[in-house]
From Swiss-Prot:
Residues 11-20 have a biased composition (Basic and acidic residues). Belongs to the UPF0328 family. It comes from the Eukaryota. Pfam families: DUF2463. This is UPF0328 protein ECU02_0020/ECU04_1700.
Amino acid sequence: MSITSIPQPHETNEQHHTEIQHHRSAILNNDLVVLISIAFSALLYFIFDKDNFEKNPCLRLITTLFPLSYLAAQHLLLFHTSWKGNNKPEDTLHKALRYFFSALFITFATIFILSIIILTNDNWSKDDDPLFFSIVLPSFFIPPTYLLSISCSLVPGQTGFTDTGINILIDVLILLCFIVNFIFMHEKSKYRLYSAVTFPLLVLVRLLTEKYYPSGKSSLPTTTWRVVAFVLIFILVIYTYTDMGCEAILTLDYYFTYLTR
């Protein structure tokens, strides 16, 4: 055997280090996009008044475009990860799981694209609508997808929760923010605003800790508690976005019925 065919340890270590750096870079970029999406929508709310949102569909489009585009794009990336994440032969269960993930993520991406159109065509006529759509809604819909894409592995056979160290605490706090937002979603409560402000702050903390004190990822995401954590996050994703999809379908049905009269 030629000596050139023997794997060199330093090459393997260098490749592993490169993969870790690439993964960290992807996480940091994801955090930045989340912060920009939320901050931009919130900034528009403070710049313009209610009449501007009600009369200007372009302003409504710009306000919802960033957070909902992030969600649509992220689900397409999750689809790509679940579909291309494993080149090894699969058994029937893993193959079925991969097809289920892929179909679900494509569906959710479509829902968010349709939601951009629906929210742009809505008049935002209620007094609370600009605040709700520009600040409350992004901080409600983004956390489940954020946790699924940052804290979990979707590779068949390695599916589970992967965060370690301080990031686990941050994930728990993000989940609590989501639950608070869910409880007070349709109420004019100060608690939903607290949650809407806390979530981007937690993302910022995570970005800084990942940049300067990275915790790394677990090499055993399939341990029992990690699988349970993944299932909990995934259930939140399915419930939240299925409900949104039903609302989108009902709204589209109303529009089509109105147009055909």
